[in-house]
Regions:
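Active-site-proximal loop/helix segments of hydrolase catalytic cores
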Residues: 176-216
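Short beta->alpha connector loops
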Residues: 22-24, 95-98, 205-209
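Short, Gly/Pro- and small/polar-rich lid/capping loops
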Residues: 1-12
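Active-site HxH/HxHxD metal-binding segment of metal-dependent hydrolases
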Residues: 76-144, 148-164
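Short beta-strand scaffold segments in enzyme catalytic cores
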Residues: 24-29, 189-193
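Beta-strand-turn-beta hairpins that frame and shape the catalytic cleft
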Residues: 10-16, 29-35, 142-151, 194-200
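Pre-active-site segment of Zn-dependent metallo-hydrolases
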Residues: 33-92, 101-105, 160-176, 207-216
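Short polar catalytic/cofactor-binding loops
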Residues: 22-26, 41-42
């Protein structure tokens, strides 16, 4: 290397560990910060046909109580505590219960910041999360933090029930517990997490907007 030449190579990426919770749920850590995507661990047993032409699959000898769509679900704290001892940021792709119903409990327990749409913020506030632990986004934001950055990407849910989609709207702000029916989609987001020299593209649903992810 000549005297006038400079090294331009980037530092080697650090280690990042990913844990899959099942469904859309992930835990990502660089050994310092812990990031969660759609951490739904309670796995409630629901009854109804909101998301398809048939009831939820029956499991023999399932001890979980059945929750109907006009009833409020309960967080399985034992399971959540076992799998989520720490969290710093919780990114929620959309506001269906099977993506975000555990998030308020996790945020209150760990002090994590919840990132998501207006509907997601209402779920957090309904669940007793302090407003300073919420970050409302619409898609298009790109935040630089101390050791990582987060780009929020407008996205789409997937069509349900014979390609028809009937779940638009906003989750209400209310004092009493939400029913399953009230966990509407509320808009869908994807996230690009940049941490420890890595870029991780996170989707919580099965659709996307092609132009929004071009060049990533």
């Amino acid at each position: 290397m000549g005297n006038n030449e400079r090294r331009t190579s980037r530092p080697a990426p650090g280690k990042v560990f990913l844990t899959h919770f099942g469904a859309a749920g992930w835990s990502i850590t660089d050994g310092d910060k812990v990031f969660l995507l759609d951490p739904y661990l309670s796995r409630i047993r629901f009854q109804g046909r909101k998301y398809g032409p048939t009831d939820a699959t029956e499991v023999p000898d399932d001890p979980r109580p059945i929750v109907k769509f006009n009833e409020g679900p309960a967080v399985n704290r034992e399971v959540v505590d076992r799998h989520v001892p720490k969290a710093d940021y919780i990114m929620l792709s959309h506001s269906h219960f099977n993506h975000c119903m555990d998030a308020p409990y996790i945020a209150k327990k760990t002090g994590a910041v919840i990132v998501g749409t207006e509907s997601t913020m209402n779920i957090a506030l309904n669940g007793g999360v302090p407003e300073e632990q919420t970050l409302a986004v619409k898609g298009g934001e790109d935040y630089a933090f101390d050791t990582f950055s987060l780009r929020v990407i407008p996205s789409l849910h997937s069509a349900l029930s014979c390609k028809l989609y009937r779940d638009f709207g906003t989750v209400p702000r209310k004092d009493e517990p939400l029913t399953l029916d009230e966990y509407v989609e509320g808009g869908t987001l994807a996230y690009l997490l940049r941490v420890a020299g890595h870029e991780i593209l996170l989707f919580g649903s099965m659709n996307f907007i092609e132009r929004e992810i071009e060049g990533l």
